[in-house]
């Protein structure tokens, strides 16, 4: 899918490197760690953009206010975009060059990772929860020690600096998602079990 129209919609240059995350704004989705991790990268790459998408639960809108304040106080605020929940998530994944899952607690089934993989994105996340099954480290993504934003930043940086590696990882993500996590693979595996 061509992301140029989506980039135009959000005012992002066609040649900008976009590092993105999609997640509910809550105590453990890791928006704070994400901002901490991308800040040095954005400082070093003035054309790069960090993109956050997600809303808070009803009654917890104050979390969004806190996040907005953290963004506006950031030394790279001009390179950070944040939107509320966006129904056309495929458009967002196609907008991103790197997908990040910075959840500070283990997420047993982060479907956002599978969705980004299906869109051919390399994944960076913390080494806990379901992402460890989805990402084959060094093949379609990189994992960092949980709750270590500096290490997360290093992993993002590695992909930010290497277009070829991003493309290789992206292709591997599509292949891995189809082979192991698609509906077709589920049906195939279920059929094999049933035959036994």
Show which residues each predicted segment covers.
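A short, well-ordered alpha-helix in the C-terminal region of glycosyltransferases
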Residues: 8, 151, 158, 165-179, ...
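Nucleotide-activated donor-binding/catalytic signature segment of Leloir-type glycosyltransferases, i.e.
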Residues: 64-84
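A conserved mid-protein helix/loop that constitutes part of the nucleotide-sugar donor-binding site
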Residues: 17, 21-40, 150
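Conserved acidic donor-binding segment of nucleotide-sugar-dependent glycosyltransferases
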Residues: 137-138, 142-149, 158-164
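Acidic donor-binding loop of glycosyltransferase active sites
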Residues: 94-108, 121
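A short helix/loop element that forms part of the nucleotide-sugar donor recognition site in Leloir-type
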Residues: 1-12, 67-69, 189
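Short alpha-helical donor nucleotide-sugar binding micro-motif in glycosyltransferases
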Residues: 85-86, 92-96
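Short hydrophobic beta-strand element within catalytic cores of glycosyltransferases
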Residues: 122-125, 135
